[in-house]
Amino acid sequence: MSRRRIGFWYRLAAVIAKPPLVVLFKRDWRGMEHIPADGGFITAVNHNSHIDPFSYAHYQYNTGRVPRFLAKDGLFKRGFVAKVMKGTGQIPVYRETTNALDAFRAAVDAIERGECVAFYPEGTLTRDPDMWPMTAKSGAARVALKTKCPVIPVAQWGANLALPPYSKKPAFFPRKTLQVKAGPPVDLSRFYDKEPTPDVLREVTETIMAAITELLEEVRGEKAPDTPYDPRRARLEQRRKADRGTTRGSTESSSEDSK
């Protein structure tokens, strides 16, 4: 999609969102040459702040190829925000409902029309204590295998310094630098002739996330952990510790009662 076809609603959103971004933040944008000039494609982006969709959208808007985000369906229900979401062609995600596959179909359709669909593969803000990308969901992998379109990894850093994950108190000053870096397409060709089994989807997802993490290492100038943070594993470990604590407490109580 060329800049001439961006449309009224996306231009309106840009008019509203760009001025505060320009005033509040400095920019360090790299890798724009990797954003395809034509044809449908996926961008896969790390997620570490509630405001990083705006900083990333600003980056890509300036390439002339606007992204279609997958966003929770509640944003499409009422008010001005719903009008903007619908008008800019964002894609609602209906989690755990009979409409859950609609987002997949809509993403595939958008790519086949020559548009860009932006995925946050982690599905939510990272829970990694040091804000590295964590284990991801398979949505981007599914669409990539279905369409065989280019998958552009994107790393971003800086919005999280202004508004950390799960924080409600922004710290805009001193001005932070929004760093965004796109990389070359992830080579997924070895998966194209395979059935999208859970194992294949997991491997494709890990390949995409490895590319994002490598870019973020370059942006941050430091090494990521060898193993991505796994929130499910962390929750299980917390439950095990809680269960051990409960068992220990019960044993000690029984010992006291028998005295």
Please place each PLM-identified region on the residue numbering.
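A transmembrane-helix-recognition feature enriched in membrane-embedded lipid enzymes
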Residues: 1-31, 37, 79-88
